């Protein structure tokens, strides 16, 4: 796979260092034997840098996974993909592995991972564990989940403000970008909770937060075009990496004054302000005596909350456009849920069972992906995330599972997501059935599994166990609020007759980001 990024000619000393390290890397690859794992589905002889393997993986990952799993006869063998050198295991092992401390989710997604997200490089610390701020981010998400009931109304205010400002009150049909609209809407609602009301509508802040993850993805692609041994050096010379660090500095200039005011309020003993992860995390870090970077922490909150959520929201919108017969039943459900005259209340969101079924069925067919660049064409470098393989781990020691399956120390592995097409679990699995999970609620055995936020081995979109996505509850609320406002206030339909093409890049499904819909204002039956 050719890189879309070009390395500018560096200073002579830097060039000499790079050339020397490159030669050492090539010699190491040629002279040091590699310990092969079984069933390297897309391994090619003399493919030193795995370029052919990456091409195979990019072109047909779904078929590679299916082919590999079909070869799993002996339980001690699992398929491996040369792209990144990791195992893909059937879902049946996920329950046993989910909380086993002999496997590390952190190392699988950071230092040891072939999908290296380069947390050790300046500007790249904000995703996943990070280096300085993880001790405040995860408790911050837990605190946010405890505040969900009080956060519904402020999030609803931001959804309403965004739609009125951007979709307007125009009663005539006009065009809106699905991707840009959903990202902007979710970004503003999330910012209200992350940095508070002072900054949540700031255009510069939104531009940074919406582009940071995309810029980071482009920078990662640029770095990974070079051998791993060069990563600690090469990032200093890449414009895309410098851009990431510039964005962090810009975000810091906006966040720091708010943080300083929050600290002054706290020092004076003023009454607590409305919840924000910015204020809560800072107080928590102070109380615990922990050092952290406030800007990187908030960038991580933002990266985690916007892109996956907005991607799924956009897919749900397009599925509803595909099935316009759903619009009126959904509206009736929303009116019934919010017909108390008290605006958006958290308990009302729990009544939206049809909406939740539509959300979960969409997620089953089109697992959420984190888009890192919007401009077309849609290419593998412009997407990140793992949609059809999930729950990555690395073995910290050699582990033998209960059925005799052995996972050697240092092995990186994830779990396939193929059972979402298992007809014994989901009748007619290839068909979009918006009522599927509503019917499941009526089955006493399966009722507890129908919830959108339920993490289970047969639906791995949110992972499983103690590393399951902690932000899924907030995502559930944001998507329901967004859909409620949109369905009540607007008519909408596809531009054209068919859904935009669903494409797969690596492990990720995504619609063409150029998808557009027509919208027009209508009179809502209830006020949120």
Curated annotation (Swiss-Prot):
Q: Mind listing the GO molecular function terms for this protein?
A: heme binding; iron ion binding; monooxygenase activity; oxidoreductase activity, acting on paired donors, with incorporation or reduction of molecular oxygen
Q: What is the lineage of its organism?
A: Eukaryota, Fungi, Dikarya, Ascomycota, Pezizomycotina
Q: Which PROSITE patterns match?
A: CYTOCHROME_P450 (PS00086)
Q: Which UniProt keywords apply?
A: Alkaloid metabolism, Heme, Iron, Membrane, Metal-binding, Monooxygenase, Oxidoreductase, Transmembrane, Transmembrane helix
Mode of membrane association:
Single-pass membrane protein
Biological role stated in the UniProt entry: Nonribosomal peptide synthetase; part of the gene cluster that mediates the biosynthesis of the ergot alkaloids lentopeptins A and B. Within the pathway, lenC catalyzes the post-NRPS oxidative modification steps using as substrate the N-acyldiketopiperazine intermediate produced by the NRPS lenA. Lentopeptin A forms via a stereospecific hydroxylation, followed by a spontaneous bicyclic lactam core formation, while lentopeptin B is produced through an initial dehydrogenation, followed by a bicyclic lactam core formation and stereospecific hydration.
Gene Ontology cellular component?
membrane
Pathway assignment reads:
Alkaloid biosynthesis
Q: What is this protein called?
A: Cytochrome P450 monooxygenase lenC
User: Which Pfam families did the record assign?
Assistant: p450
Q: List ligand-binding residues for heme.
A: 469
Please give the cofactor(s) recorded in the UniProt entry for this protein.
Answer: heme
List the SUPFAM superfamilies: Cytochrome P450 (SSF48264)
Membrane-traversing stretches: 5-27
Domain of life of the organism encoding this protein? Eukaryota
Q: What happens when the gene is disrupted?
A: Prevents the post-NRPS oxidative modification steps to form lentopeptins A and B, and leads to the accumulation of the N-acyldiketopiperazine intermediate produced by lenA.
Subcellular location(s) of the protein: Membrane
Cross-referenced Gene3D superfamilies, in alphabetical order? Cytochrome P450
Per the record, the GO terms for biological process are: biosynthetic process; secondary metabolic process
Q: What is its EC number?
A: 1.-.-.-
């Amino acid at each position: 796979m050719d890189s879309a990024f070009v390395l500018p000619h560096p200073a002579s000393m830097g060039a000499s260092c790079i050339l020397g390290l490159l030669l050492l890397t090539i010699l190491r690859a040629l002279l040091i034997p590699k310990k092969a794992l079984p069933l390297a589905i897309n391994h090619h002889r003399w493919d030193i840098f795995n370029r052919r393997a990456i091409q195979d993986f990019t072109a047909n990952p779904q078929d590679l996974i299916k082919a590999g799993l079909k070869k799993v006869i002996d339980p001690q063998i699992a398929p491996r993909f040369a792209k990144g050198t990791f195992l893909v295991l059937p879902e049946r092992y996920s329950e046993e592995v989910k909380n086993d401390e002999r496997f590390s989710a952190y190392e699988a997604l950071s230092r040891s991972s072939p999908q290296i997200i380069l947390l050790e490089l300046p500007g790249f610390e904000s995703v996943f564990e990070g280096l300085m701020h993880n001790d405040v981010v995860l408790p911050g998400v837990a605190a946010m989940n405890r505040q969900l009931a009080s956060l519904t109304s402020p999030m609803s205010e931001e959804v309403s403000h965004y739609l009125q400002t951007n979709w307007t009150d125009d009663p005539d049909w006009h065009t809106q970008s699905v991707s840009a609209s959903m990202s902007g809407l979710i970004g503003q609602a999330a910012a209200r909770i992350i940095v508070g009301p002072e900054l949540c509508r700031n255009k510069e802040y939104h531009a940074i937060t919406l582009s940071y993850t995309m810029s980071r993805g482009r920078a990662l692609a640029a770095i990974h075009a070079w051998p791993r041994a060069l990563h600690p050096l090469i990032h200093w010379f890449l414009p895309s990496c410098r851009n990431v660090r510039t964005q962090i500095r810009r975000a810091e200039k906006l966040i720091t004054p708010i943080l300083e005011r929050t600290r002054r309020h706290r020092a004076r003993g003023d009454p607590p302000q409305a919840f924000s992860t910015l204020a809560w995390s800072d107080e928590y870090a102070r109380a615990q005596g922990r050092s952290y970077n406030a800007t990187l922490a908030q960038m991580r909150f933002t990266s985690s909350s916007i892109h996956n959520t907005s991607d799924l929201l956009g897919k749900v919108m397009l599925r509803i456009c595909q099935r316009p017969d759903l619009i009126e039943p959904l509206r009736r459900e929303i009116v019934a849920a919010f017909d108390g005259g008290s605006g958006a209340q958290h308990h009302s969101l729990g009544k939206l069972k049809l909406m939740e079924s539509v959300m979960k069925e969409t997620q089953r067919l089109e697992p959420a992906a984190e888009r890192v660049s919007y401009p077309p064409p849609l290419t593998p470098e412009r997407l990140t995330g793992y949609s059809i393989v999930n729950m990555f781990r690395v073995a910290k020691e050699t582990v033998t599972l209960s059925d005799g399956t052995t996972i050697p120390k240092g092995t990186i592995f994830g779990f396939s997501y193929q059972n979402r097409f298992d007809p014994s679990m989901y009748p007619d699995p290839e068909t979009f059935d918006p009522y599927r999970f509503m019917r499941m609620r009526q089955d006493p055995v399966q009722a507890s599994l129908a919830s959108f936020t339920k993490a289970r081995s047969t639906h791995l979109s949110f992972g499983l166990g103690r590393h399951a996505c902690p932000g899924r509850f907030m995502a559930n609320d944001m998507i329901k609020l967004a859909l409620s406002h949109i369905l009540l206030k607007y008519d909408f339909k596809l531009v054209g007759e068919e859904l935009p093409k669903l494409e797969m890049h690596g492990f990720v499904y995504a619609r063409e980001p150029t998808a557009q819909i027509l919208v027009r204002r209508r009179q809502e039956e209830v006020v949120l």
